[in-house]
Amino acid sequence: MTLEQLLQPVAFVQCMASAMLAILFLQSGLDKVFDFKGNLAWLTGHFAKSPLRGVVLPMLVSGTVTETAAGALAAAGTLHLVVHGTHALALWGARLATLNIVMLFLGQRLAKDYAGAASLVPYFVLCAGALLVLGMPMA
């Protein structure tokens, strides 16, 4: 893809949305990988009085895998967008990112952490917007 093509509004927003998802989900996912014990301890306390108290470990594992995969796909998708002008990988990254945010939102609601759930809404809007723009044909 040429620089002129990349700077066209649709292509540029596709690239930037995918880059945002890559940064957000890779950083968060890798934090969970490198501080798994700390995250598990915090989440165990967070969900202690919720219906999810017995499944914190599988939730953390599935959330970490989904989050890290979303970030990796978004990162690879951003590079693929810039080099080849195709956005299939970025679109899959956005799909997984959206799924991950919905998973987190459900967990926060079940833990009755309504402020925590509300703080996820802007991330959902970013993910949904990325899905929409990545689904658009390149100009």
Annotate each language-model stretch with its function.
Residues 1-31, 61, 65-139:
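Extended, low-polarity transmembrane helix blocks
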